[in-house]
Amino acid sequence: MNTLKALTGVIAVMVLGGCATVTPVSGQFPPITPRQAQTGAENGKLVRWGGILIQAQPKAQETCFTVMALPLHQDGRPYLGRKKSDEGRFIACAPGFYDPALYAAGRELTFVGTVAGVQMEKIGGYEYPYPRLRAGTVYLWPLEVREPATSTVFINGGWGGGPWG
């Protein structure tokens, strides 16, 4: 009987563990931020960066994404509660075509790739040092559907009344 209980427990753990979602950007990565990589000292290092997409630019052989960096949750999803944090910006380029209609401004993205230098670009009139990422993985997070909040009004505090008294 104890063997049956143990076997049932093992099967339950395996079934429930199978429900866990593992994204292609999961794993352990060094805590290097785009702001730290602006100096160029982090070139060649494998990192996981993410944030809010500012712009996607398809080119002949690759698509480059300009991103406002945010801290990431453990699963790699950008932490939207920290939009005011100063993680900096970065440009991630990945081989192939990524449709700007799907990869639209405001979407959450996470990249895994190698730091590949610093690229100067203008933000308004300011020259900004964008760390450049050679992305091996591009992950577009699914949109979260938020249901509108509804409320129920109880008359008489929910007690009494109604058709039965």
Q: Model features per residue range: what roles?
A:
Residues 1-19:
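Sec-dependent bacterial lipoprotein signal peptides
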Residues 19-165:
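OB-fold and OB-like single-stranded nucleic-acid-recognition modules
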